[in-house]
Amino acid sequence: MTLELHATPEEVMRAVETMQQFAEENGVHEKTIFGLALALEECGSNVVNHALQGDAEQKFQVCIEKNGDLFVIELRDRGPEFDPTAAADREMHAEDDDLPGGWGIQLVRRYTDEVRYSRIAGENVLRLTKRLGTAAKQE
């Protein structure tokens, strides 16, 4: 399923709700859905606020699919090239709560099994994959 969305927070939430419904209909565990919803909201918000700078006239795509035991969410936008996966892994500590930025990708990595970025034909493509048999990252 592919959603064509305007760059607004409301459209990000529409994508999250659509993904949740699709996942429920396909028998995905509620803990997994919760994590995927957080990851999609984080990535979608970054597309809207950073890549497309909150310009509601701009559009981006969210593609959602379940293929066997893989659940895939792909976000595509035509904003400036930016690879969020290039951020180094960091351990979260309570004292880091006041530090600005950079933590969203850590959240996304926590709730997915694979995060891949590519630049294809002028588009940022961020692909989030969750293996549905894996519960280790959900705890």
Regions found by a protein language model. Give the residues of each.
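Conserved beta-strand-loop-beta-strand hairpin that lines the nucleotide-binding pocket
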Residues: 1-2, 48-139
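STAS-typified acidic loop motif
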Residues: 2-14
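Structural signature of the histidine kinase catalytic ATP-binding subdomain
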Residues: 7-10, 28-31, 55, 66
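Short, structured helix-loop boundary elements
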Residues: 9-12, 33, 37, 57, ...
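Heptad-repeat coiled-coil signal-transmission/dimerization helices
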Residues: 12, 16-19, 108
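Conserved short strand/loop->alpha-helix "switch" segment adjacent to the catalytic nucleotide/phosphoryl-transfer site
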Residues: 17-41, 97-100
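Acidic-residue sensor for enzyme active/binding pockets
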Residues: 41-42, 74
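Hydrophobic residues in the alpha-helical elements that line and stabilize the ATP-binding pocket
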Residues: 43, 47
